[in-house]
Amino acid sequence: IKDILGILLLMLFLMLLVLFAPDLLGDPDNYTPANPLNTPPHIKPEWYFLFAYAILRSIPNKLGGVLALVSSILILILMPFLHTSKQRSMMFRPFSQCLFWILVADLLTLTWIGGQPVEYPFIIIGQLASVLYFFIILVLMPITSTIENNLLKW
């Protein structure tokens, strides 16, 4: 009974919020008049695609940016096939651990840059982080796996 009461109170609160104050949690930038010739600066994707959006914006060419965006997402799908190490766990592979945390820091940087405006320092940081993203996944991870295989005599 007390669980049903809690659910009903939560539903009541949400219904009151939606019906009587729908703009309370909204963004005021959404009410500016639209110009169909350009994208407003406050438009950005959800937080989980901001890293790909930063990669898209880091390339000045539109086609190149779209190809980089698609490849940045597809590369995450292909990641298991790029894993060439004989040992599956990273517990005894310190180079791979370090590389993993560098990749996490790079993804966090790209996510932060994706939410920033297109201005001078953010453009350069986004370009460097984009190059580092592809370099880590396509070059450093396979090389590190090969080195660790040789060190472990697999």
Swiss-Prot record:
Instruction: Please list the disulfide bridges.
Output: none
- Tell me where in or outside the cell this protein is found: Mitochondrion inner membrane
**Keyword annotations of the record:** Electron transport, Heme, Iron, Membrane, Metal-binding, Mitochondrion, Mitochondrion inner membrane, Respiratory chain, Transmembrane, Transmembrane helix, Transport, Ubiquinone
What biological process terms from GO does the record include?
Answer: mitochondrial electron transport, ubiquinol to cytochrome c
Parts of the chain that traverse the membrane? 1-21, 63-83, 95-115, 122-142
Q: How does it assemble?
A: The cytochrome bc1 complex contains 11 subunits: 3 respiratory subunits (MT-CYB, CYC1 and UQCRFS1), 2 core proteins (UQCRC1 and UQCRC2) and 6 low-molecular weight proteins (UQCRH/QCR6, UQCRB/QCR7, UQCRQ/QCR8, UQCR10/QCR9, UQCR11/QCR10 and a cleavage product of UQCRFS1). This cytochrome bc1 complex then forms a dimer.
Give the protein's recorded name: Cytochrome b
Give the species this sequence originates from.
Answer: Cervus nippon pseudaxis
